[in-house]
From Swiss-Prot:
Residue positions where N6-carboxylysine is found in the record: 124
Record's subunit section: Homodimer.
Note on cofactor: Binds 1 [2Fe-2S] cluster per subunit. This cluster acts as a Lewis acid cofactor.
GO biological process: isoleucine biosynthetic process; L-valine biosynthetic process
Gene Ontology, cellular component aspect: cytosol
Keywords: 2Fe-2S, Amino-acid biosynthesis, Branched-chain amino acid biosynthesis, Iron, Iron-sulfur, Lyase, Magnesium, Metal-binding
Active site residues according to the UniProt entry: 517 (proton acceptor)
Species assigned in the record: Blochmanniella pennsylvanica (strain BPEN)
Name this protein carries in UniProt: Dihydroxy-acid dehydratase
Catalytic activity annotation: (2R)-2,3-dihydroxy-3-methylbutanoate = 3-methyl-2-oxobutanoate + H2O; (2R,3R)-2,3-dihydroxy-3-methylpentanoate = (S)-3-methyl-2-oxopentanoate + H2O
Database matches in Pfam families: ILV_EDD_C (PF24877), ILVD_EDD_N (PF00920)
InterPro entries named among the record's database cross-references: Dihydro-acid_dehy_C, DihydroxyA_deHydtase, DiOHA_6PGluconate_deHydtase_CS, ILV_EDD_C, ILV_EDD_N, IlvD/EDD_N
Amino acid sequence: MPKYRSITTTHGRNMTGARALWRATGMTTEDFDKMIIAVVNSFTQFVPGHIHLRNVGALVSEQINITGGVAKEFNTIAIDDGIAMGHSGMLYSLPSRDLIADSVEYMINAHCVDAMVCISNCDKITPGMLMAALRLNIPAIFVSGGPMESGAITLSNQNVKLNLIDAITCSVDPNISDVDQQRIESAACPTCGSCSGMFTANSMNCLTEALGLAQPGNGSLLATHSDRKKLFLNAGKYIVHLAKSYYEENNYSVLPRNIANKSSFENAMMLDIAMGGSTNTVLHLLAAAQEGEIDFTMADIDKLSRKVPHLCKVAPNTQRYHMEDFHRAGGVMGVLGELHRCGLLHEDTRNILNKSLLETLLNYDIFSCDNFESKNMYAAAPAGIRSTQAFIQKNRWTSLDTDRRSGCIRSREHAYSQDGGLAVLYGNLAVDGCLVKTAGVHINLQKFSGPAKVYESQEESVQAILTGNIHSGDVIVIRYEGPKGGPGMQEMLYPTSFLKSMGLDLCCALITDGRFSGGTSGLSIGHISPEAANKGLIGLVHDGDIINIDISMRSITLEVSEHILKIRHAAEIARGNKAWTPTNRNRNISISLKAYAHLVTSADKGAVRDKSKLLG
């Protein structure tokens, strides 16, 4: 039977100094026989998805203390990708994921913590904490801050729902007046919470629910709704029970690696494919799997993407539905319920409630369950009140969306497509694979061929788009923006958003070794592996080269002869120490980013550290 880890610092004469310090934090003699449970918060005033979390940690801590543990709270950093977007700040976004994972490890191991509750929400915070949980493998529960309500505005006598992407695209839309631009900006993000579409933050919070590490409703229940408070209170209670089950009952099944096993990862990926989630989730799931020593790779994702139907569209893939509508339709459990009826899920996986997925669906799938409490939770609705505070309203929908023919979540028979919302493409341009969110690709763009317009930075591509140098039929190539080449694998939200604003999103393609925001739509292909900085073929593309893309065939091909490619390769090698680096790019790379670039692997490996460089 495992001993409390915290005994290391709370027992024995030689730990007198440690106990003296613990006493200074408020612990008593009686507390030294209890479990120490970390409340890993991520409150910050920089991020709307985290602005409301200051007092939430205290709620969780109180429940831990009441239930028999000793709660100790600390904070991680949290970068707002939307604010860091479009300038050098985005270089720090993906590296912050690994920094968060490390900081959680440091705090947990330095203080010999027994278990933890992870309070996350936005883009890199949930993945960073997930990596830490699987690395540490101590009892853990995730509970996120919840989604933002969608914005609303009246334009040309039409009521329009808004999200962050609308605020970005309107900035260069010549049809939007300065007055309306200001109105959209002021209305797009009305409350605290993670941005209101199925962007990266909400996608990841849905996936922690599917992995079994978070409670039902975690991914979709609005940040402003009073029902969400119950998730935090329950997390404080449940973590004590989980930890006691492990430490006192020798129950190893409650550990993160046993809950989030390969079958759970496959369930989570099937959810992501079915709901057309962010391509960033692939990067983060691959990274988390490596931390948990789980054999889950791009090959598994490719296999799943070929059999899972696309059942759900939420902004940015449609303007009709936002996270509040997804929740009304049953949220994560609603989609998993449909996948279960397709016979696709591993129904025996277990969660933090010590229930199998099948048992959980029987209680939380609104299409088939009779549980009043569950259905009442999924009726939680927005209030339309601007606020930075959590739990301020109790609005409810008068009915749930159980329309599986044309509603937010659909059955297989009425799916948007029998192919899922994400696809892995292969070819000479991406020998190790690349990703496209097919949920955001118009049917007329499923097969595309065009001449390349090559840029060696996001900034250069944006300038080309805004100055009219991109034309219908072009394939925009943005390279040296991968994990190593950027470094930091910037999100290309501005190029894709500006293409949309200029009316080019339905007649152009964009490919990159960088990545995309969860807010991206259009024929946007990212994560090209190997990246240019790792001698990938994308580094040899010239202006005018024809690139063929065929989503149905899962292919992406550079139509240049092997003879020409050998000549180009030799010319690149001849550049000496400048080989496989961008030409004439003016970018200040800090020491911390250089260290990141030195250790990072490619996108198809999750952009995690190359352990071989550390182990020798």
